[in-house]
């Protein structure tokens, strides 16, 4: 998919920028290297914000949009994707190269997500998409 190609290119950019060396994104928490561990940890922070955004808006968190019908919480993953590549991905590689502990990485992510008002952005974006989709479905002008 186009999303997968973009993410792969962003991983390469981050790896090259910090001089990380060989990197392969491990699936489902199987990575033992610091960058993979930080990516998993940070992604869960983003998923928490995504779940909060769906709750605030009263949207069903399990609605499958981009992440398909086979994943529970599909909408949460979709909304989390709005901030993961901008905040979590670069911080994972920076923290890995600095030798940060999990708590330091977590704190850096939380500060970046707070500074950028990530939750507000996620809520606003999901709201605009939901209202636009509802208007299209009802035949009203967007």
Predicted stretch roles:
Residues 1-142:
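Active-site helix-to-loop segments that bind/position phosphate- or nucleotide-bearing substrates
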């Amino acid at each position: 998919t186009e999303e997968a190609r973009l993410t792969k290119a962003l991983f390469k950019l981050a790896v090259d920028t910090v001089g990380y060396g060989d990197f392969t994104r491990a699936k489902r928490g199987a990575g033992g290297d610091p960058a993979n561990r930080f990516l998993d940890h940070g992604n869960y922070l983003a998923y928490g914000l995504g779940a909060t955004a769906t709750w605030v808006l009263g949207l069903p968190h399990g609605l499958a949009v981009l992440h398909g019908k086979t994943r529970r919480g599909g909408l949460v993953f979709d909304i989390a994707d709005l901030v993961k590549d901008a905040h979590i991905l670069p911080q994972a590689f920076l923290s890995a190269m600095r030798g940060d502990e999990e708590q330091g990485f977590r704190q850096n992510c939380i500060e970046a997500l707070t500074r950028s008002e990530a939750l507000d952005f996620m809520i606003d974006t999901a709201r605009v998409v939901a209202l636009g989709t509802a208007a299209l479905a009802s035949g009203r002008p967007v």
